[in-house]
Amino acid sequence: MEISSHQSYLLQQLNEQRRQDVFCDCSILVEGKVFKAHRNVLFASSGYFKMLLSQNSRETSQPTTATFQTFSPDTFTVILDFVYSGKLSLTGQNVIEVMSAASFLQMTDVISVCKTFIKSSLDISEKEKDRYFSLSDKDTGSNGVERPPFYSSSWQEEGGSPHSHVSPDPGKPWNKYGYPPASQRSPQRPLAKHEQRKEPSKKAKHVRLPQPSEVVHFKPGKGEAQTDSGNHVSQSEEQVPVDAEVDPAPAGFQYSQGPDGIARSFPDDLTRLRFKCPFCTHVVKRKADLKRHLRCHTGERPYPCQACGKRFSRLDHLSSHFRTIHQACKLICRKCKRHVTDLTGQVVQEGTRRYRLCNECLADVGMESLPADLEAEQHRTAPADGDKDCRWHLSEEENRSYVEIVEDGSADLVIQQVDDSEEEEEKEIKPNIR
C-alpha cells in the first residue's frame, strides 16, 4: 500500500532542516551570499550538481562549496525553494533569469515550466491585442451613436421611402440615389494642377467621416413635399463640391454598408505584426522568429556539435562551426570519402593530378604492394631529368600488358606507349602525324 503524502512530508522535513541549517553538508556561494543545502538533494535535482558532486565523491567527509557568478542570489533562491518544496515562484520579471539559471544547472523540469509560462503570457498578449482590434473596428462617435460607413451620402440607397427627392427617370438612374442631374448642378471651378500639388490639405479635408448631424438623407413629410423640393435641390448642390473633390477609390477598395465596412476597407498592416516579445520591444511577423528571438533572453542553446559538444542557439551557426572548424583542411579519400591520415592513406600522383587514397582503396585497385624504397626505385627507373611524367611502378608482366595502342579516329593519330628515351619517341611519333 502506497501513501502518497509520505513524499511531500519527507520533502517538508528536508526543507525545515535546510532552513534551520541541520545536517547541511554543502554550501553554495552566489555573489557573496551563502546558501546551505544537502548534497543528496542537490545531486538528485540538478544535472550540474550531479556531475560536480560525482567528481568529489571520495571527499564525502568534508563539506562541499560551490561558487556561481552567472546568476543573482534572488534567482537561486527561487530555484532552491523549488528543489525543496516543488513550488516555482515565477513572475514576468524573473522568468528569463530563472530559465537561464535552470539551463546552466541542467534542470529540465524548471526549463519546461518557464517555457509554458512564457507561452501563456504570449497567448494573453495575443488575446488582448485581438480585443483591441475588435474594439477599433466598432467605430463609434463620442456620444455613443454609431457612425455611418464611408461615402454613405452618395452610395447608400434609400429604400422604402414614399417620396423621393427628385422624380425618378428611367433614363437617368442616378436620380434614385439623390444625386441631381447635370442640368441642375451649378458649374464648379475645377482645381488647377499646381493648386492640387501645393494645397493637398484643402483636398484632404473633404475625405472624412460625416458626423451624425451632417448626413444628407432628407425625407420630407406629406405636407412639405412641394415646399421643400427646392430646398433639397440647393442642399444637393451644396453637397456636390464635397463629393466631386473626393478622390476616386482604388481598384482594390471595397464598398460595404454596415459596421464591418470600415474594418474591411483598411489594410491589415497593423494585424500582421502580431508577435511581440514580452521582455523587450522586438516585434516579428512569424512565431518561429519569436521563438528564435526568445533564446537571446533565455540563453537556450538547443543545437549541440556532435564533434566537440559545443552548443549553439541557431542551426546555421552550428553548420558554419562544423564546416570551418572540423572540416577545414580535412584529408579524405577520393574514392570512399572517409577521413584519412598520413598513416592510413597515401598520396597518389597520376600525371599532373594528385589525390589521396586510403589503404583499403589502394588494396582494391591492386596497389597494396607499393615498394618501401619508392624514391630509390624512382631514381633507377627515371628515363631522364627533363621527363616530368610520373608512371605507376608495376611489375615486368604488368608493364608488358600495359603497353597498348590508343587510336583516335578523329585525327587518325596512333600513339604507342613504350619506355624509351625522348629522342626515340620523337622519331617514332613524327612520321605518324598527318
Curated annotation (Swiss-Prot):
Sequence positions bearing Phosphoserine: S161, S167
Gene3D superfamilies registered for this protein in UniProt: Classic Zinc Finger (3.30.160.60), Potassium Channel Kv1.1, Chain A (3.30.710.10)
GO molecular function: DNA-binding transcription repressor activity, RNA polymerase II-specific; RNA polymerase II-specific DNA-binding transcription factor binding; transcription cis-regulatory region binding; transcription coactivator binding; zinc ion binding
Transmembrane feature ranges: none
Linked residues for Glycyl lysine isopeptide (Lys-Gly) (interchain with G-Cter in SUMO2): K172, K176, K193, K430
UniProt xrefs under Pfam families: BTB
Keywords assigned: DNA-binding, Isopeptide bond, Metal-binding, Nucleus, Phosphoprotein, Repeat, Transcription, Transcription regulation, Ubl conjugation, Zinc, Zinc-finger
Localization, UniProt: Nucleus
Zinc finger C2H2-type: from-to: 275-297, 303-326
Biased composition (Polar residues): 226-238
Domain BTB, first and last residues per copy: 24-92
CDD domains: BTB_POZ_ZBTB8A_BOZF1
Region described as Disordered: spans on this chain: 134-238
Described function: May be involved in transcriptional regulation.
Record-given protein name: Zinc finger and BTB domain-containing protein 8A
Lineage: Eukaryota, Metazoa, Chordata, Craniata, Vertebrata
